[in-house]
From Swiss-Prot:
Protein name: Metacaspase-1
Superkingdom classification of source: Eukaryota
Keyword Disulfide bond: no
Biased composition (Low complexity): 10-44
Region annotation (Disordered) ranges: 1-129
Native source organism of the sequence: Candida albicans (strain SC5314 / ATCC MYA-2876)
GO molecular function, one term: cysteine-type endopeptidase activity
Any matching Pfam family: Peptidase_C14
GO CC entries: cytoplasm
Compositional bias (Pro residues): 61-70
Gene name linked to the record: MCA1
Its job: Involved in cell death (apoptosis).
SUPFAM superfamilies xrefs: Caspase-like
Length: 448
């Protein structure tokens, strides 16, 4: 992939989700015992073979929204990822400079975003238990005073025609930022496809095992940080055993491990089960996703707008566009296009009820007592750019997050979202998203 192009959805069949879940259970119970880093250099063999064959997770009948105009669609690689460890070469140059609290990115040629929000004083999250709703559902903010652990995943897909240039740099840059903000190298695990240690390559199994390490023995007020930079996509949402759907747009979001062709993608339902449902009340998870279609990739049901209010599914904009199309067709005498536009409007109104039901079901099933926050690079129907900033390849979302937090670490949830949007709006159409496992006060201080 070349700078400025989206990290697009791959085509082709994907693995059966029930088989993926089974594979997760097997990997999860292998047990890591000691810190992941202590086993890091012992080598970790790849799974003996791929999971059972293809199944119910086929490609959607209609493709998810494509890339912005002028950007190419990326096909799946023609062959499996390189199997020889020698082919995983390190980048030719070092990542950009250190990210301290008051430092800016790069070599001094970067733009200074002097009009950033976030200069005010923000209250830290309350330490007592919170509740909401008629059933008084309990949750708790984390004060992030406990252990700090981080899992950073960057996949360039080296040697394939789907190759990206920024993810490995993103991981190195986020690591530098975390080290400057209270995290220890002993509690940071990196999976990148330039590694020579087999266990550190971002295969599907290695990613799932590393997630297990991240959440293992989590306690209230711990601070966990998860960063993924790579390809993302969508697949058709499947109902649960009761026939209920939890995606208001009809699609689940996925991320693509290095070995996705043989072992499949990782679906948002599984990410939520492993990283959100397993955490105790008051444990913090900050997840940063720099990938396409990543708006709800962690299935957190409370998504916030740049006004600090909850977003609800709204397909009425599509209906308005359809009516405009029909009116223009009527004016030009194009009867067939007019009827087509009106048909789309009817379908949109029918979908609104389905979307609202899925959104409500997601809140019922995916609300969690832990303190999970997701910062994602774009909406579910958007692509996320692999770009170049100050002469260095980077993911646009990773760059925006690090730029905001490095120039002014005093941010609220809302100001962080607004500032990231402002940085990206100058060059990209993608819109960063903020979502949470429980309702949040977006004017509280963002801590991690």
């Amino acid at each position: 992939m070349f700078p400025g192009q989206g990290r697009h959805t791959y085509g082709g069949q994907q693995s059966n989700y029930s088989n993926q879940q089974q594979g997760y259970d097997q990997g999860y119970n292998q047990g890591y015992g000691q810190a992941y880093g202590q086993e890091y250099n012992q080598g970790y063999d790849r799974p003996s073979g791929p999971p059972p064959g293809q199944g119910q997770y086929n490609r959607p009948s209609g493709p998810p929204p494509g890339p912005p105009p002028g950007q190419g669609q990326y096909n799946r690689p023609s062959g499996p990822p390189p199997s020889q460890q020698g082919q995983y070469n390190r980048p030719s140059g070092p990542p950009p400079g250190q990210y301290g609290n008051n430092q800016t990115r790069g070599s001094g040629n970067e733009q200074n975003y002097g009009n950033m929000h976030g200069s005010g004083h923000y209250s830290r999250p309350p330490t007592d238990s919170q509740s909401f709703g008629v059933e008084n559902y309990n949750y708790q903010y984390s004060n992030c005073s406990g252990r700090k652990k981080a899992l950073l995943i960057g996949i360039n897909y080296i040697g394939t025609k789907n190759e990206l240039r920024g993810p490995i740099n993103d991981v190195n840059n986020v690591e530098q930022f975390l080290l400057a903000n209270g995290y220890s190298s002993d509690n940071i695990v990196k999976l990148t496809d330039d590694q020579r240690v087999q266990r550190a390559i971002p295969t599907r199994q290695n990613i799932l095992d590393a997630i297990q390490w991240l959440v293992k023995d989590a306690r209230p007020n711990d601070a966990l940080f998860f960063h993924y930079s790579g390809h993302g996509g969508q697949t058709e949402d499947q109902p649960d055993e009761y026939g209920n759907y939890d995606e208001d747009d009809g699609y689940d979001e996925v991320i693509y491990p290095l070995d996705f062709e043989t072992n499949g993608f990782i679906i948002d339902d599984l990410l939520h089960t492993m990283m959100v449902k397993t955490l105790p009340q008051g444990c913090r998870l900050t997840a940063l996703f720099d990938s396409c279609h990543s708006g709800s990739v962690l299935d957190l049901p409370y998504m916030y707008s740049t006004k600090g209010v909850l977003k609800e599914p709204n397909v009425m904009k599509e209906a308005g566009a359809g009516l405009l199309q029909s009116a223009m067709a009527y004016a030009t005498g194009d009867r067939s296009r007019m009827l087509s536009g009106l048909g789309g409007v009817v379908k949109t109104f029918m979908n609104q009820g389905k979307a609202e039901k899925a959104n409500e079901y997601s809140k019922q099933t995916n609300t969690a007592p832990c303190d999970a926050i997701s910062l994602s690079g774009c909406k579910d129907d958007q692509t996320s750019a692999d770009s170049k900033e100050n002469g260095t390849a980077t993911g646009a979302m990773s760059y925006a997050f690090l730029t905001v937090m490095s120039q002014n670490p005093n941010q609220s949830y809302l100001s962080l979202l607004q500032n990231m949007r402002e940085i990206l709006s100058a060059k990209y159409s993608q819109k960063p998203q903020l979502s949470a496992s429980h309702p949040i006060d977006t004017n509280l201080q963002f801590i991690f």
